[in-house]
Amino acid sequence: CRHGLGYSIFEGEKNGIAATQEVFVPRGDACEIDRLTLENKTAAPRTLDVFSYVEFCLWDAMDDSSNFQRNFSTGEVEVEGSAIYHKTEYRERRDHYAVFWANTPVTSFDTSRDAFCGVYGGPAAPEAVLAGHCSNSMAHGWAPVGAHHFHITLAAGEKKSIIFGLGYIENPQEEKFAAPGIINKT
């Protein structure tokens, strides 16, 4: 890997598939942009299952690690295409939300940590990855996450890229909703 001013690049290769992840945070913006490029270096077509994963905080690190009775009931998400919106407490007392999106249509997704990782599992060996697909879970309460699953076929020598964005957005109080219960995403 290598790091520069505001960016990092990670590279790896296994079984004839090269992967490059380029990560940067634009100056002045509350977001991170990632580009994952996969290249098939073999002479035959290859089919891959690619998963992304972020674990959303609940906006207060001290409460996240101590106020469990509250945390088990507050997680809230909205999914639109390949965008997963983390809107915990947006209706009640927040004017901000987070979004994790991709520029490629998903095969499946998860927004519940228990569904993606497994009830007693973790990011080291997520249940969804072991199963080869997500379950399209919608988090209601504890542990909202953003996980995408892409089923990708690469021809011999072909390269494909997926762009991911993780952002934080604030809306003025009077412009919070586009419709009842639907966050304003403009």
Place the predicted regions along the sequence by residue.
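Conserved catalytic alpha/beta cores of large enzymes that bind or transform nucleotide phosphates
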Residues: 1-20
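Beta-strand-rich interaction surfaces with strong enrichment in secreted/lumenal proteins
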Residues: 10, 21-24, 136-139, 149-154
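Short beta-strand and strand-turn-strand segments in soluble, beta-rich domains
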Residues: 17, 63-69, 138-148
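Short alpha-helical segments and helix-capping/turn motifs at coil-helix boundaries
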Residues: 20-22, 32-35, 84, 145-153
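Short Pro-Gly-centered flexible turn/kink motifs
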Residues: 46, 152-170
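Short acidic/polar mixed-charge low-complexity motifs
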Residues: 15-17, 44, 158
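Polysaccharide-binding surfaces and accessory modules of carbohydrate-active proteins
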Residues: 8-11, 24-131, 173-186
